[in-house]
Amino acid sequence: MEKLTIRSIDRKDLNKASEFAAQGMNYSSYTENPIVLYLYRQYALSSLLIKSTVTLGAYLDGQFVGFLFARFDGEPKVSVSWGRRLFVTVAEKLIGLTGYQGAIGAYDRANQEMYQEFATNRPEGEVTYFAVDPALKGKRIGSRLLEEIKKNYKNKRVYLYTDSNCNYQFYLKKGFDIFGRRPVDFGGEDSLTCFLLSAIL
């Protein structure tokens, strides 16, 4: 019988975590350039790791199969190497010089607008980054990660950002509600809807 263990993520698994996130969040739909895709998935994971206070990993018979990062008020942020911090700083400057700045800016503005409306609810935490191995759907890996957060942070009001390119329906099945939604048009046929979801754990 397979054994699923939820514990603090091993740093050696961060690269695999970025792969799971890129697949689950369909990053490849934004670019066909493999170098840009690799750099962006590393940037996304690193920038969200830096702001997190909880970094859980899921291990199925010892194999890394998923993760959940979160941030809660009053808790210290996780330790992050100076090299990873430097990478985020450099990546942000490079993004500013590329054609992706407009798209990323529009996405971020949509999230900021929703949060400004939501902030009066006084959230105590945020699920910052969350993905599982897409090849292992149906094994309740994502559910177990969320259950671990609920167990440790019962009755806390949390929120998260997601979009229509992701499996946001998963969260709705787990008790999250849609607080806000914003359409984002990247030009041409490329568009999506950003969501802010919230729940009391």
Regions found by a protein language model. Name each.
Residues 3-19:
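A short beta-loop-alpha structural element at the N-terminal edge
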Residues 34-55, 60, 69:
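Active-site rim helix/loop that mediates acceptor-substrate recognition in acyltransferases
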Residues 57, 63-72, 126-131:
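Conserved beta-strand in the GNAT
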Residues 74-125, 186-189:
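Conserved acyl-donor/pantetheine-binding loop and adjacent beta-alpha core of acyl/acetyltransferases
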Residues 124-125, 152-164:
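Conserved GNAT acetyl-CoA-binding A-motif
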Residues 132, 138-151, 173:
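Conserved acetyl-CoA-binding loop-helix of GNAT-fold acetyltransferases
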Residues 143, 164-181:
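Conserved active-site alpha-helix within GNAT-family acetyltransferase domains
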Residues 161-165, 184-201:
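C-terminal "cap" of GNAT-fold acetyltransferases
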